[in-house]
Amino acid sequence: MNNNKKLSQTAGTVGGMTLISRLLGFIRDLVIGMQFGATFVADAFFVAFRIPNVQRKILGEGAISAAFIPVFTEIRNKKGEEDAWKMAANLFNILLTILITSSLALALFAPYIIMVFAPGFPQTSEKFNLTVLLTQWMAPYFLFIGLAVFCMGILNTYNKFALPAITPAILNICMILGTLIISPKLDQPILGLAVGVITGGLLQFVIQIPAIIRCGFKFIPSIDWKNHETLRISKLMIPAIFGLAVYELNMLVDTLLASLLPEGSISYLYYGNRLVQLPLGIFGVALGVAILPMLSHQVANKDFSEMVKTIAFGIRLILFITIPATIGLILLRFPIVNTLWERGEFNRLTTEGTAIALLYYSVGLCAFCGIKVIVPAFYSLNDTKTPAKVGVYSMLLNIILNLILMGPLKHGGLALATSISALFNVILLIYLLRRRIGLMGGRKILSSAIKLFFVSGVMGIAVYLFNLTFFDPNSMLALKLFILFADISIGVLVYTAISRITQNEELTFLIELTRKRKNKSSV
């Protein structure tokens, strides 16, 4: 199969599963918003949940796969399946030991951890005590989700992407049920949400066990800390974690500084980030997950010309999707937040605060997605240090910009700093990758980007005028949903039509791929 087709189909599968999960995530946030709004209780939960959830995003969206896939594939090819699975079992036992220890430490040292991540919470306040309690309750999630992402890495190695991509939906369902069913029965309702988190994490791990066993995994009750291949994975994984963690670390810095701002700032950033996570998860993360096994295979076969083509196509595909998405999110930020969440405790003030966060996070969408595509290229070359170094520079820039911008722009300044540092990150990564592998079709990428900005600008005018004419934030929910859907549909139609007229290669490729898949299914 053509590499571009394989990449697009795999990314489409992951993206489709991710879309289902993210839609459930919006329902989850809607339920949480209605129940808890932007109160100190919500702030406490979001701080407590972010600490273990960062582990899922860092490990689950690349770090384990970045280290595991190349080494596991190499062992399978050189020594056979049996040796590869022995290494995997040993790695599982080591990971299990580390995760149990880390979960216990998280629960035990929760007060001190919260002092670091939310210094603006007074230590004697109800807000601080609740955050500590929630962190301790959700500590087991740290264990369960770590094991779940290990399973994801194994399944991705065998090109099984659908199940790992859909498992986050289980977490969202459990959190929804926890809020609706358990919370009303408790004196401290927010603890019902914590129960949902723990249950969701456990199920994400358990549901993947049969799949990895079918692939060939066998549990071996022994640990070899000095195993050469395991140590090799660890050496690759440590810098990989930091390289992929930059975005999440920047978000943690935002949370830390937002705790010094007026109440609700943490919630504004959370909800704004959730909206940006939709296109980031569907397209950026999906393409990043799909591209690593392909690049690793090309490097193993020393097919560097195909590797360059794959990377260039991935970048153009990301730009084709994220440039119009950025314009759309910026122009429709208020209608989107108002329609999706403004009800119950989520009032107009919360909508306006969230819309500001969404505006500034949207500026960095192309960069956020670009990082997910470029970083795996380094990992396929067994280079996990370069992204980590770039990550250090990016995080330092983010901290400096945070301190400069949070004064005049409040929480919006924190979001903007994250976006600018991500843009710096992806530009530097591309520059360093080009030095490593040579030309990547930069002129073609730049020419495509210029056309896409023009087409997206025309689309933006159509979307803005329609929204200005028809959207009323005080109208009935059903009408607002209809208007918002119509507005987005008009944007998609205008963008597609003009892209077709300008003969955009990415659109032409996707249309042909869709037609072939339809013809296959009809045979």
Task: Annotate the PLM regions.
Residues 1-523:
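Membrane-embedded alpha-helical bundles of multi-pass transporters/translocases
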